[in-house]
């Protein structure tokens, strides 16, 4: 969708769960806008802060020394009010009150749904995919995934060390309520014996128990299970496995550490380009768009198109993850 109104003031907000690299996107958006002669404003605490008019002017200095920092300097929050027509109208009215005629929204599907509503109310919006879950269908990359999956991988390596020393079975629970990309990638990168994903919910716990017993018979000193939070129940699963196998079994829930930490080079670079690209789209007169990375290029899609498609698990990656497991070694 295009607009004929020239954008003069752009607001930037981060919404929903934080993701490493968000600061790189904020920095890029602010500096690109200032370079193009646009006034830049930061909206604190996402849509909730927008409702409460927590809006600040942003200068190039305000985003200095932020590219290497995890989290988001604009803070973030979830906002139930933004799901209501009254809340959406209030958000649009606040934008107009503060002269914000363009909005960069960094977040996931829920954040984009809010941006879509604001676009319908006359506020030019562009979404930037920021979520560690990698669950936005229109893009091959989302800000934060690379850092989160590396954080999880390094943690699982450490758990493996102690698991081997004590000849234990270890269940490591990673983030991914509805999408198992962190679990899948870590399962491959860490050489896990079993991977449990929300997309493959019909797993057979007895088969896992049988694998553990058989692998121990073959001399395997540890057994690593990477479990997505969408499956969950890692602690109770560990108790059942230990009772059935007689092998000490421990659960480790990585939790919010996956959201923190200094972003990787990949997250910094991709986020920087996406943040700048979002501003460029607004200045080109585009609205109701989402920035994406597809087939080696930075592109943009209509928000409605981005929200209408559910991302599917890459079956070949799943097949290879299972094929390379020790469970299938003869």
Across the structure, where does each feature detected by a protein language model lie?
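Phosphate-binding loop/pocket of nucleotide- and phosphate-handling active sites
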Residues: 289-330
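Catalytic, metal-anchored helix/loop core of enzyme active sites in primary metabolism
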Residues: 247, 257-272, 279-283
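Glycine-rich oxoanion-binding loops at beta->alpha junctions
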Residues: 2-3, 50-103, 110-111, 143-150, ...
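Short, ordered loop/turn segments at secondary-structure junctions
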Residues: 15-18, 43-49, 78-79, 108-110, ...
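N-terminal phosphate-binding or glycine-rich loops at protein starts, especially the Walker A/P-loop
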Residues: 2-51
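Accessory alpha-helical/coil subdomains and C-terminal extensions
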Residues: 105-107, 117, 124, 145-248, ...
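Short glycine/serine/threonine-rich phosphate/pyrophosphate-binding segments
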Residues: 18-29, 51, 85-89, 102-116, ...
């Amino acid at each position: 969708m295009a607009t004929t109104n020239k954008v003069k003031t752009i607001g930037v907000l981060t919404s929903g769960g934080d993701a490493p690299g968000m600061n790189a996107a904020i920095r890029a958006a602010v500096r690109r806008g200032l370079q193009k002669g646009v006034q830049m404003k930061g909206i604190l605490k996402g849509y909730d802060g927008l409702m409460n008019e927590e809006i600040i002017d942003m200068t190039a200095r305000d985003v200095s020394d932020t590219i290497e920092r995890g989290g988001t300097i604009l803070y973030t929050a979830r906002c139930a009010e933004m799901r209501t027509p009254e809340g959406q109208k209030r958000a649009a009215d606040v934008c107009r009150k503060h002269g914000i005629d363009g909005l960069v929204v960094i977040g996931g599907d829920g954040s984009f749904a809010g941006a879509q509503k604001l676009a319908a109310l006359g506020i030019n919006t562009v979404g930037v995919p920021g979520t560690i879950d990698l669950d936005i269908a229109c893009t091959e990359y989302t800000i934060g995934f690379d850092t989160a999956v590396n954080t999880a991988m390094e943690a699982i390596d450490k758990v493996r060390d102690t698991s081997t020393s004590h000849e234990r079975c270890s269940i490591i629970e990673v983030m991914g309520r509805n999408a198992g990309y962190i679990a899948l990638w870590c399962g491959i990168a860490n050489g896990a014996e079993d991977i449990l994903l929300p997309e493959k919910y019909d797993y057979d716990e007895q088969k896992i128990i049988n694998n553990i017993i058989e692998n121990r018979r073959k001399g395997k000193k540890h057994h690593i299970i990477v479990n997505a939070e969408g499956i969950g129940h890692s602690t109770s699963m560990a108790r059942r496995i230990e009772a059935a196998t007689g092998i000490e079994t421990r659960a480790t829930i990585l939790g919010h550490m996956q959201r923190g930490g200094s972003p990787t080079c990949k997250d910094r670079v991709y986020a920087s380009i996406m943040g700048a690209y979002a501003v460029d789209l607004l200045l080109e007169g585009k609205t109701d768009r989402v920035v994406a990375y597809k087939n080696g290029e930075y592109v943009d899609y209509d928000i409605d198109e981005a929200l209408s498609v559910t991302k599917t698990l890459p079956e070949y990656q799943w097949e290879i993850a299972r094929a390379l497991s020790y469970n299938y070694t003869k």
